[in-house]
């Protein structure tokens, strides 16, 4: 891949569906996926196959009809999740298994009840298992922006050695700000010996309103895949708005010297389609501020 190309990873059908009050049928997901293909996104995360029969069916349906982009399924670092993800993806022209596990101390203690070495072993084994099914494997250390840096370097290095071709750095709770996120990406690039063997990706949440800015800061630092949702959909206050990220890269090519594969003339039709299917109304700034405030309250 050319070093000036930023890959666009759309997770509207997975993380976007976690927005409050949103649920899509298999047929609606297929309609959105076909429009995302017209838009020119590089990767469509079509769902989380192990989470429900509906997600499994949606992924399978999309793989049968959408052939140009990579189709991904999310999977926890659990053998059965990896197996179910592959079962849903096996007919895809370009399948990707995206596996994740928490990595911050707070998540390890309060959610997983495991120590760092146990988590590292689980991550490596899951990447190795996914690699037996397909060449394209993405790994995400969940809550990476609150993870001890030395441990994060080790975890990333180990999963790349195990076969991960994309390493995604999630700001899971929307905690960071652009300057420190940029620094974290730079530190990863400078301290993980085999980082050149994987594409570095970012996945930013908007709890403090910084998701798009954090994504752009990461791109400036060398990330070459950005994850986000159409219309900034997503859990709590949402994900990075892909429209904002894409148009920043395209409009300010003079600054970044970067491009994407997106057909920008399809951004408006895609946004409208998603809005119409979800019966969304324009979210005013006071409403958005309320959503962000609520998200911050929930995370305390």
Q: Language-model segments: what does each one mean?
A:
Residues 1-78:
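N-terminal capping/small domains of soluble enzymes
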Residues 8-11, 44-46, 70-75, 95-99, ...:
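Hydrophobic faces of well-ordered beta-strands that scaffold small-molecule active sites
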Residues 24-41, 64, 79-137, 142-195, ...:
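Alpha/beta enzyme core
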Residues 51-91, 115-116, 148-155, 184, ...:
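Active-site loop-helix segments enriched in His/Asp/Glu that coordinate
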Residues 176, 185-280, 284:
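Catalytic alpha/beta core domains of metabolic enzymes, predominantly
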Residues 281-300:
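Single conserved hydrophobic/aromatic residue that forms the stacking wall/gate
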């Amino acid at each position: 891949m050319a070093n000036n190309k930023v890959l666009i990873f759309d997770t509207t059908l997975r993380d976007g569906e976690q927005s409050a009050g949103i649920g899509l049928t298999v047929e609606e997901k297929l309609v959105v996926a076909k429009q995302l293909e017209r838009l020119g996104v590089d990767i469509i995360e079509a769902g989380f196959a192990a989470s429900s029969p509906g997600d499994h069916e949606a992924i399978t349906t999309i793989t049968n009809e959408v052939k140009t982009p990579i189709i991904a399924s999310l999977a926890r670092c659990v053998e059965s999740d990896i197996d179910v993800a592959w079962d849903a993806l096996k007919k895809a022209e370009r399948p990707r298994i995206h596996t994740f596990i928490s990595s911050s101390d707070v998540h390890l203690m309060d959610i997983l009840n495991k120590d760092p070495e146990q988590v590292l072993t689980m991550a490596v084994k899951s990447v190795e298992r996914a690699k037996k099914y397909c060449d394209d494997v993405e790994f995400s250390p969940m809550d990476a922006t609150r993870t001890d840096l030395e441990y994060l370097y080790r975890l990333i290095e180990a999963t790349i050695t195990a076969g991960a071709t994309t390493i995604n750095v999630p700001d899971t709770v929307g905690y960071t700000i652009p300057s420190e996120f940029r620094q974290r990406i730079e530190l990863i690039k400078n301290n993980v010996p085999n980082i050149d063997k994987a594409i570095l990706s970012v996945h930013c949440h908007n709890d403090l309103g910084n998701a798009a800015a954090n994504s752009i800061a990461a791109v400036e630092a060398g990330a070459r895949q950005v994850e986000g949702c159409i219309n900034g959909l997503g859990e709590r206050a949402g994900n990075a708005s892909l429209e904002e990220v894409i148009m920043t890269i395209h409009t300010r090519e003079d600054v970044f010297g970067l491009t994407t594969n997106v057909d920008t003339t399809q951004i408006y039709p895609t946004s409208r389609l998603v809005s119409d299917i979800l019966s969304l109304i324009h979210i005013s700034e006071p409403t958005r501020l309320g959503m962000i405030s609520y998200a911050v309250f929930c995370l305390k």
